[in-house]
């Protein structure tokens, strides 16, 4: 009666396990026993195979993915073999036939070396000289296991103390933004919830025009058209960056500050008058009292000293001299203000930090420092491909680690936080004649990745990586602009996809003086090369898990769609939850209304699938 059983499994060169079924198992009685001499068998029909599902998910932790296989039209006088083909490396399949019929279960096991992604595979059935196949989609899923312990090596002592914000650059070209969009602004800006909104007045928004002693030397109208509405929203506490000196203190050709004792003192007095204007009831000039319209209800606590000196014709020692002159003059007017130092364009930090943190007697900073600020753009060239932009994120993490290391060499600076006060996809802009400012011989082309689905992956990836590195603020550059840079279209007032990305990052990972940042939970992820995972726990016991699909479809993609990824989020270590929501932002998201928040059923393992660049935010409530 041995012919009534299953023949042993045989292993093909590919590593696929193939079950060879004896025909006698598939028909009444034991005739045939898999041999053509055992009898004529059942006349064959067209050989076919059907599957119980068109998609099989095989997690990288070795949990089998299964599909039921049914064979029809087989010649029962010949053996039937079932195998899987076109499997990616690191995946093994095994077919287990069921007794009493031409069917069974195919198991697919992905090892840790199996690359995550979506593949086209097939089940192949061979019966004598006949062959039939049925294709299916094989998904190799990343597994992210969220632990119940705080990872104290990340963030600020294990906490994600990073707030979201945005920026304005008042000038004669954009100062009417709020006037032009009264139906939506500043309500939309307030909805975004930014903290310490950055204000960087340039050109005619610099309020001091001359130094003649006449009242006409000062004009705040262009600057205040932006500043005054900003003072009414969010935390009512913007950061005013004194980005440049008044034009009469600068070189007419380069626009760079001209160093000299008299110019330094004039710049310091200008800065002190700005503090007087917004915080102390104003100042008198040419017989006229200049005072902020919103004083005393709204004042400005945070001030930044100069913008990107390291690419604007200033040496590190000159910047320190400037800083050490301006800050005391401003503090002498209002001792409660806080100061952001450096505001660097990302370059080689070893050229700037060592001298800044040197002992004051050796030329280091000797004035108050509350924050050290830097900027991060991964490119200044629209032709750079998607993978290049993603690859530069770990570099800014190294940069931040270095800055903290240097600040730690001085006792009075070791607890100073880092803020990234400018961040977007591309720093380039039109130099005025249609050419690139960064690459003058190249035509300027708007980079849509600042508002496309690419941004839905890129900004959350940056947020997670920088927050884990201890960065404490991430500023979007800039609020009202074009499709390269804006959260809101400066012409129409409509929201871009970037608005909703930043909004939900702020909502899901709040960090305010009254609501300290969440704990960063320990995490084990089977693959990090194409997905970013962040798990946090709030003081109320709720847990937020962010899943970012940053998989590039092709190495040449520039604003591509990305590649699908499935992530199995394992929260079994966290116990049970009473409810859960899911929010996804990707290329299908409506940029006007934003993503929908969906109620989902809590489970120990939650599957998240993104069809390309994007982010899913899970919130689990106790």
Task: Identify the role of each PLM range.
Residues 26-29:
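C-terminal motif of bacterial Sec signal peptides marking the signal peptidase cleavage site
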Residues 31-143:
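Long beta-sheet-rich domains in secretory-pathway and surface-associated proteins
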Residues 141-183:
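Mature N-terminal, pre-catalytic/accessory segment of carbohydrate-active enzymes
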Residues 189-389:
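Substrate-binding cleft and catalytic face of glycoside hydrolase catalytic domains
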Residues 379-437:
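Glycoside hydrolase catalytic-domain groove-lining segments
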Residues 420-531:
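Aromatic/acidic polysaccharide-binding cleft in carbohydrate-active enzymes
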Residues 526-576, 613-619:
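Carbohydrate-binding surface patches
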Residues 599-622:
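C-terminal beta-strand-rich structural cap/linker in extracellular carbohydrate-active enzymes
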């Amino acid at each position: 009666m041995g012919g009534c059983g299953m023949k042993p499994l045989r292993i093909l060169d590919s590593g696929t396990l193939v079950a060879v079924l004896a025909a006698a198992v598939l028909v009444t009685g034991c005739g045939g026993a898999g041999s053509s001499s055992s009898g004529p068998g059942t006349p064959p029909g067209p050989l076919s195979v059907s599957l119980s599902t068109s998609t099989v998910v095989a997690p990288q932790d070795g949990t089998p993915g299964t599909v039921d296989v049914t064979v029809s039209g087989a010649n029962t006088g010949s053996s039937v073999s079932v195998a899987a083909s076109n499997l990616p490396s690191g995946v093994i399949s095994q077919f287990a036939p069921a007794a009493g019929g031409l069917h069974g279960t195919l198991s697919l096991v992905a090892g840790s070396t199996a690359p995550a992604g979506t593949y086209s595979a097939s089940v192949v059935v061979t019966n004598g000289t006949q062959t039939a196949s049925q294709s299916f989609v094989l998904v190799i899923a990343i597994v992210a296991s969220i632990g119940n312990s705080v990872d104290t090596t990340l963030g600020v002592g294990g906490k994600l103390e990073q707030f979201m914000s945005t920026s304005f650059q008042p000038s004669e070209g954009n100062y009417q933004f709020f006037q032009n969009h009264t139906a939506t602004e500043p309500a939309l800006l307030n909805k975004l919830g930014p903290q310490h909104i950055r204000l960087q007045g340039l050109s005619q928004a610099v309020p001091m025009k001359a130094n003649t002693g006449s009242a006409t030397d000062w004009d705040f109208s262009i600057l205040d058209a932006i500043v005054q509405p900003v003072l009414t929203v969010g935390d009512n506490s913007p950061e005013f960056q004194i980005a440049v000196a008044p034009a009469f203190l600068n070189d007419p050709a380069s626009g760079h500050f001209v160093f000299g004792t008299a110019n330094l003192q004039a710049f310091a007095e200008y800065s002190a008058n700005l503090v007087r204007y917004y915080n102390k009831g104003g100042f008198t000039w040419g017989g006229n009292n200049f005072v902020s319209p919103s004083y005393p209800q709204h004042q400005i606590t945070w001030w930044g000293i100069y913008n990107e000196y390291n690419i604007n014709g200033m040496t590190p020692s000159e910047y320190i001299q400037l800083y050490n002159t301006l800050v005391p003059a401003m503090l002498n007017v209002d001792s409660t203000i806080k100061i952001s130092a450096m505001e660097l364009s990302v370059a080689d930090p070893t050229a700037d930090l060592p001298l800044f943190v040197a002992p004051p007697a050796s030329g280091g900073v000797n004035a108050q420092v509350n924050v050290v600020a830097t900027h991060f753009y991964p490119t200044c060239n629209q032709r750079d491909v998607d993978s290049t932009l993603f690859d530069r994120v770990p570099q800014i993490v190294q940069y931040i680690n270095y800055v903290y290391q240097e600040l730690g060499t001085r006792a009075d600076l070791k607890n100073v936080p880092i803020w990234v006060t400018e961040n977007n996809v591309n720093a380039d802009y039109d130099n005025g004649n249609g050419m690139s400012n960064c690459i003058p011989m190249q035509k300027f082309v708007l980079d849509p990745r600042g508002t496309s689905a690419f941004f839905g992956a890129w900004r959350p990836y940056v947020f997670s990586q920088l927050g884990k590195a201890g960065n404490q603020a991430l500023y979007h550059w800039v609020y009202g602009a074009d499709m390269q840079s804006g959260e809101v279209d400066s012409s129409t007032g409509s929201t871009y996809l970037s608005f909703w990305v930043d909004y939900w990052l702020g909502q899901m990972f709040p960090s305010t003086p009254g609501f300290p940042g969440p704990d960063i939970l320990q995490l084990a992820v089977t693959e990090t090369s194409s997905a970013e995972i962040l798990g946090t726990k709030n003081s109320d016991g709720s847990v937020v898990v962010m899943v970012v699909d940053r998989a590039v479809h092709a190495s040449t993609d520039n604003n591509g769609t990305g590649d699908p990824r499935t992530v199995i989020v394992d929260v079994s270590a966290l116990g049970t939850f009473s409810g859960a929501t899911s929010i996804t932002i990707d290329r299908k998201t409506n940029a006007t209304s934003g993503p929908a928040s969906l109620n989902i059923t809590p489970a120990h393992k939650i599957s998240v699938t993104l069809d390309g660049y994007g982010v899913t935010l899970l919130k689990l409530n106790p």
